[in-house]
Amino acid sequence: MIGTANVLEVCKDLGISDRIIEFSTSEVFGSMAFKSKEEDQTVAGSAGEARWVYAVSKLAGEHLAKAYGKEYNLPIVTIRPFNVYGPGQSANGALQIFIERALRGEDIHIDGDGNQIRAWCYVDDFVDCIMSCITNPKAIGESFNIGNPRAVITILGLAQTICRVLNSKSKIVFEPPLSADVAIRIPSVEKAKEVLGFSSKIDLEEGILKTAKHIQDKWKVTETVN
C-alpha cells in the first residue's frame, strides 16, 4: 500500500499521461467469489487472519489509485488477477508446487478435502490482457478481472489432472485445512471481453504441459551449471 502510494505520488509529480497499471488481486472478493464481476461488493476478511492482510492492502491501493485518477487526471487501470500460473511463477504457488512434485514423483499435499474451486489462467493469456490495458484508451479509469472461467477445477481435480497429464505416480496426501481458505474463486471476464476483446486461449492441460516443460528446462540448466 505504501509502495502504491509512492508510485502514484511520483506519477502525479511527473505528470504521467500514458498509462498506469495498478495490480490488485482477486482476494478482494473474499472467500466466496463465484463469477465475480468488477462492480461486485469487495470484502476485507476477518480481522486477525493473516491471509486477509494482503487483500486489505490491495483494496486500499485500489481506492487510492481511483482517487488519484480522479483528482489528478491520471490514466489509471486496475486489474484483478485470478490464479495466474505458468513459467516464471513463484515457487509457492499451488500449481507450480504440484507440477514440481509430480515431476519428481513426490507426494502432492492438499490442505483440506481438496474441494476448493479455482479458475486457472495461463500467464500468456494474462499478459495479452495486460497489453490491451496498456494500449486500449477505453481501459483508462476502469477495473478488470483477468482470468480463465473456462479452466475451472477443484484443487483435488487439479492434482489428479497434473498426475494424469504428466504420467506421474505421485500420491495425493490430505493435510488439515487452513484456518482461512477460499472456497471458490471464479471470475466473470465479460467486461474485459467487451471492452478489451479479451479471451483466454490456453486450456488447463496445455498450460500444465507448457509449465512442466519450463520447469524441466530450468532444472537442466541448473544441473549443467552445477
Which stretches of residues belong to each language-model region?
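Non-catalytic, hydrophobic alpha-helical segments
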Residues: 126, 130, 146, 158, ...
